[in-house]
Amino acid sequence: MNNQQLWQRYQDWLYYHGGLDFYLDVSRMGFSDALVEDLQPKFAKAFQDMVALEKGAIANPDEQRMVGHYWLRNPALAPNDGIRAEITEPLRQIKAFVADVHQGNIKPPTAPKFTDLLAIGIGGSALGPQFVAQALAPNFPPLAIHFIDNSDPDGIDRVLNCLKAQDKLKSTLVVTTSKSGGTPEPRNGLAETKAVFEAQGLHFADYAVAVTMPGSKLSQQAQTEQWLQAFPMQDWVGGRTSELSAVGLLPAALQGIDIQAMLDGAKTMDEATRVRELRQNPAALLALAWYYAGDGQGKKDMVILPYKDRLLLFSRYLQQLVMESLGKERDLDGNVVHQGIAVYGNKGSTDQHAYVQQLRDGVPNFFATFIEVLHDRQGPSLELEPGVTSGDYLSGFLQGTRQALFENQRDSITVTIPEVDATSVGALIALYERAVSFYGSLVNVNAYHQPGVEAGKKAAASILELQKAILSTLQNESGPIALEALATKVQAPEQVETVYKIVRHLAANDRGVTLQGDRQFPQRLQIQWRS
């Protein structure tokens, strides 16, 4: 295409939403009118699937669950009064609780106010709040947020030691988020945090808040120990779509972020993505572009390039939303399909000095998504040269990279928002949630369960049970024992490698296990309990 033809294609496929001042440009994706026509029946079904989902149909058949994250920003859509109350009442409670914390009505025993917030969670209970905090938290928030989002002891120590070093532990509110209350990572982070608080002479319940399912293990703990408050999670909201539930709204509000604006932005985008006309539905346009890029089989990766520091974590947030939703072995008919779209990214223009070299000249196994923010900063900008600011450079880098990629037959999408505010962030969340839903329908997969994650949890649990058996066996041995003999004694003769990795980890952490012999030849090692 020549420049005039490209300009016409840009206008033909441009989507603009006046209320959000939002643009979506898919013109640099090379799909044809014939493909659009061929996909019309699939999109008709996708639109109908969304109608049924929002009315309360069982959209997650593998777990026999409704999927209701769209109701969170418009409770009137919920299928019954009970579910509406499950949305409106927690939101009211969150706003009241946050106001009391900010005003000092709810405060720690030895400080006038809470100054910091420690959020403990994993997956969507961390990635969403982290993205929103990076994007929207004010420079001087009423509560500065910190995260424990892993079972890494050193990572936990770094967070807690930092709070202790600044004498902030005594004024830190701890919010633990876990749907079941039994997920190991938040459970472990909670236990470690509680131990540190108690070691400092701080009664943990005076600092603790839970976000969990009513009746869960975490809910019971919060009730038994008389924590400050527990906010509910709903069965019909998955972790990766929970940012606009208590999971994300509570930490955001505590930081002083306008959560009502986030909800309103999402609601407005939801309305736009209900339109049953492909060209007038931004989420459907995204799904079309994804389908074209990977031939409906995820053959190309999605590279997210936000040209704004505040959106640095958007790619990590989308990584879970897209990959956990769409990465499925089987479709809804039971056929093996191995679906999914790999997602990665960082930020522009940093990435132009990193992997964009490969994007332009290397393996063409991707499509790019540029996130453009029109407003540069609050206040005037310095002219670095006549008529040119640093924001002009950033915009030029985006446009130049888009053009350079296109010249080498690399496809790209451009999403444009006016500024990084609560309304736009809420709209972005809603846009990609709906695009994932549409794409899941196009390729006929259940986008709302995660059997692979559950398989990993079960495997980890079996390894920990094996570790217990190894420790018990070693403690009852009178002397050193060979690795293969140990594996046989714990009834795991086919798992010698796993047994080896368990004892190596125990030995490295002074857990009473010693390894004797040449580490280059693990099969020759002798294992012994050091009493």
Swiss-Prot record:
Pathway(s) served: Carbohydrate biosynthesis; gluconeogenesis; Carbohydrate degradation; glycolysis; D-glyceraldehyde 3-phosphate and glycerone phosphate from D-glucose: step 2/4
Any single Gene Ontology cellular-component annotation: cytosol
Entry-linked PROSITE patterns: P_GLUCOSE_ISOMERASE_2, P_GLUCOSE_ISOMERASE_3
GO molecular function: carbohydrate derivative binding; glucose-6-phosphate isomerase activity; monosaccharide binding
Localization per Swiss-Prot or TrEMBL: Cytoplasm
Annotated catalytic residues: 324 (proton donor), 353, 457
InterPro entries with a match to the protein in the record: G6P_Isomerase, Phosphoglucose_isomerase_CS, SIS_dom_sf, SIS_PGI_1, SIS_PGI_2
Function statement: Catalyzes the reversible isomerization of glucose-6-phosphate to fructose-6-phosphate.
Family, similarity comment: Belongs to the GPI family.
PANTHER family per the UniProt record, alphabetical: GLUCOSE-6-PHOSPHATE ISOMERASE (PTHR11469:SF1)
Protein name: Glucose-6-phosphate isomerase
Organism: Synechocystis sp. (strain ATCC 27184 / PCC 6803 / Kazusa)
Lineage: Bacteria, Bacillati, Cyanobacteriota, Cyanophyceae, Synechococcales
Gene label: pgi
